[in-house]
Amino acid sequence: MPIVSGFKVGPIGFGLMGLTWKPKQTPDEEAFEVMNYALSQGSNYWDAGEFYGVDPPTSNLDLLARYFEKYPENANKVFLSVKGGLDFKTLVPDGNPDFVSKSVENVIAHLRGTKKLDLFQCARVDPNVPIETTMKTLKGFVDSGKISCVGLSEVSAETIKRAHAVVPIAAVEVEYSLFSRDIETNGIMDICRKLSIPIIAYSPFCRGLLTGRIKTVEDLKEFAKSFPFLEYLDRFSPDVFAKNLPFLQAVEQLAKKFGMTMPEFSLLFIMASGNGLVIPIPGSTSVSRTKSNLNALNKSLSPEQFKEAKEVLSKYPIYGLRYNEQLAGTLSV
């Protein structure tokens, strides 16, 4: 089992964003069922956010507090990672000590004493504040015992090195999927391997593109109706999607050849790339989909299959940015 800051976690984690960050959040009964199922299957690295809600922004944390109030016996079984450090209204990062401190304290307050905050990470790096300044602030919370450890999200390899020199970095969260493999070449995977820092892979299905449910432009438009923010992302533009269809079809063909679903293949590929370093955190709002995701652990990708997949997929260029031109500047800072 992977280890994050001395805590044994399952090889596939669980992202909670989709349970609350939408106009109508998942009812508690349904959310608790999914959370309990994930935990029962060993998926105990839970990824949450201080701002993962609409009304109020803290809905994700409030859901967790209600969950642990109902299931206090599960608090010590879960490793809880929470992202914060963003202005709720603008979602702009603020790495100043006062702002970061208030963010950590707000997360702790909303958990209402039901669960310790295991890992805190700023969701994005504030380019106007030296990373050392932000890390010194968070180190103070570790030293006081208010949080167990510190993580980083959407950072560059150089920032990881600088931050790690101030406080041990327990995990680095980045987007990583068959569509977004930047970390293999931009130094992030190399520095994390060198420093033995686990990589937490968010959006391992590229926000739905790798689930097997989106095969045509019509499918894309229908899918995006449930997630309005997708229309702002490059790869959900019908024109860009059409250019990426050959790649998607190649993924589907490889999955079938290897006796897997697209989600299973997508997870196993990035896990194999990390060679034990990568922990994907797919999200889900249903037990059936969570079960489907975790079924990847019942399959395996042989070294020969992994090599074949890399060779096949390298023939297809990927079109579109991970987000869009406006948001690109907030990534890998």
From Swiss-Prot:
Q: What is this protein called?
A: Pyridoxal reductase
Positions carrying Phosphoserine: 292
Q: What is its EC number?
A: 1.1.1.65
Question: What domain of life does the UniProt record list for this protein's source?
Answer: Eukaryota
Q: In which pathway does it act?
A: Cofactor degradation; B6 vitamer degradation; pyridoxal from pyridoxine (dehydrogenase route): step 1/1
Q: How does activity depend on pH?
A: Optimum pH is 6.5-7.5 for the reverse reaction.
Q: Where in the cell is it found?
A: Cytoplasm
Q: Name one GO biological process term.
A: vitamin B6 catabolic process
Post-translational modification (record):
The N-terminus is blocked.
Which InterPro entries does the annotation name? Aldo-Keto_reductase (IPR050791), NADP_OxRdtase_dom (IPR023210), NADP_OxRdtase_dom_sf (IPR036812)
- CDD domains referenced in this protein's UniProt entry, alphabetically: AKR_AKR8A1-2 (cd19077)
Write down the species: Schizosaccharomyces pombe (strain 972 / ATCC 24843) (Fission yeast)
User: What does the record give as the reaction this protein catalyses?
Assistant: pyridoxine + NADP(+) = pyridoxal + NADPH + H(+)
Give the GO cellular component terms, alphabetically: cytoplasm; cytosol; nucleus
Q: What is its main location?
A: cytoplasm
Q: Which family does it belong to?
A: Belongs to the aldo/keto reductase family.
Q: How does it assemble?
A: Monomer.
Annotated keywords:
Cytoplasm, NADP, Oxidoreductase, Phosphoprotein
Q: Where are the catalytic residues?
A: 52
Molecular function via GO: aldo-keto reductase (NADPH) activity; oxidoreductase activity; pyridoxine:NADP 4-dehydrogenase activity
